[in-house]
Amino acid sequence: MDPEGFTSGLFRWNPTRALVQAPPPVPPPLQQQPVTPQTAAFGMRLGGLEGLFGPYGIRFYTAAKIAELGFTASTLVGMKDEELEEMMNSLSHIFRWELLVGERYGIKAAVRAERRRLQEEEEEESSRRRHLLLSAAGDSGTHHALDALSQEGLSEEPVQQQDQTDAAGNNGGGGSGYWDAGQGKMKKQQQQRRRKKPMLTSVETDEDVNEGEDDDGMDNGNGGSGLGTERQREHPFIVTEPGEVARGKKNGLDYLFHLYEQCREFLLQVQTIAKDRGEKCPTKVTNQVFRYAKKSGASYINKPKMRHYVHCYALHCLDEEASNALRRAFKERGENVGSWRQACYKPLVNIACRHGWDIDAVFNAHPRLSIWYVPTKLRQLCHLERNNAVAAAAALVGGISCTGSSTSGRGGCGGDDLRF
């Protein structure tokens, strides 16, 4: 059999025919089919899941079953990863529908991508609003004032209202005086914050002298956690005996110790809420507890004040008799609460001495003190007293050895020249 004949018979090539043939007609553009009411209603039944899961390879039947369980795209975006796992497990158990491994990862990836998209939209919207405010302000000086006021948020609203009325009275309703006054007020508040920072962070020395007159002054400023809201000023504390009720616009020490018991109750409530939500449970009184107390209406409980007197409460818990005796003695002498607060350190240092200078162990061993952090000054005083005790013991041992050497006639430390 001739192979050449087979190939020539199979492939017939006619170049002239290829030139004569006309090109195929261009197909008409595809018209997009209108969305029927049935299709729109079906998409609404999915709750936006078709747009959320579309690019991630999740089967349509899986999305439909998730929608049957009552979940929407907004619901899934607000859920945590553990809750998404529970949702997928419920889907498998209820409908006996086995999810693919890629679908499980795809659902989580889609939710994370949607969260990022929403966050970017919020940031763009906020930047756009700020740009509009800046462009509408005018000159450069107004730019700085407006930007600072917008960043401060609600904390500058009373300042704006007050300065607006002042500017309206002084300038006949002009706008330039309003912004200048707002900027000047802001600079004054920033200077006050700078002056308050070293007072709050340094070891309490001079502030305790005037504590009887103005005890809660630093608690009502903006240095605490209450930026943006004005805390109601509380009456100052005075030294009172156990069971004595303070008269006038004063608060006694029994009321102060009662605040610590309230903080303990708020901590228990925060722990219960955190366990129900599956979140990290705090074991000590932290900023989260103070924020919860403020939201619950107990704005008189604030972090600076509670940390300021925590060692006084510790003495009350560890040795109530010594605490009561100290209160009676200072009440008889007419001392203010600042002097009483300073005097509470020494009994605690003595208690730490009996426990090997480990003040942290003393706090953690007590059920009512284990939720509080040890004050830095108390820890420093214990460390200082321990060093002094070690140095005194070493000097005593050295003196005894030197005295023994001089009496035996071997010289050594100089004998009679030492003075103890």
From Swiss-Prot:
Its main location: nucleus. It comes from the Eukaryota. Changing residue 240 to M: In lfy-3; leafy phenotype. One of its GO terms (cellular component) is nucleus. Gene3D superfamilies: Protein LEAFY (1.10.4180.10). Residues 233-237, 302-309, 373-376 bind DNA. One of its GO terms (biological process) is gibberellic acid mediated signaling pathway. It holds the Pfam family C_LFY_FLO. Changing residue 303 to A: Impaired DNA-binding. GO terms for molecular function: chromatin DNA binding; DNA-binding transcription factor activity; protein homodimerization activity; sequence-specific DNA binding; transcription cis-regulatory region binding. InterPro entries: FLO/LFY_C (IPR035209), FLO_LFY (IPR002910), Floricaula/leafy_C_sf (IPR038276), LFY_SAM (IPR035079). Residues 185-198 have a biased composition (Basic residues). It is found in: Nucleus. Residues 204-218 have a biased composition (Acidic residues). Probable transcription factor that promotes early floral meristem identity in synergy with APETALA1. Is required subsequently for the transition of an inflorescence meristem into a floral meristem, by an immediate upstream regulation of the ABC classes of floral homeotic genes. Activates directly APETALA1, CAULIFLOWER and AGAMOUS, and indirectly APETALA3 and PISTILLATA with the cooperation of UFO. Mutations in the LEAFY gene result in the complete transformation of the first few flowers into leaves with associated shoots. This is Protein LEAFY. It comes from Arabidopsis thaliana (Mouse-ear cress).
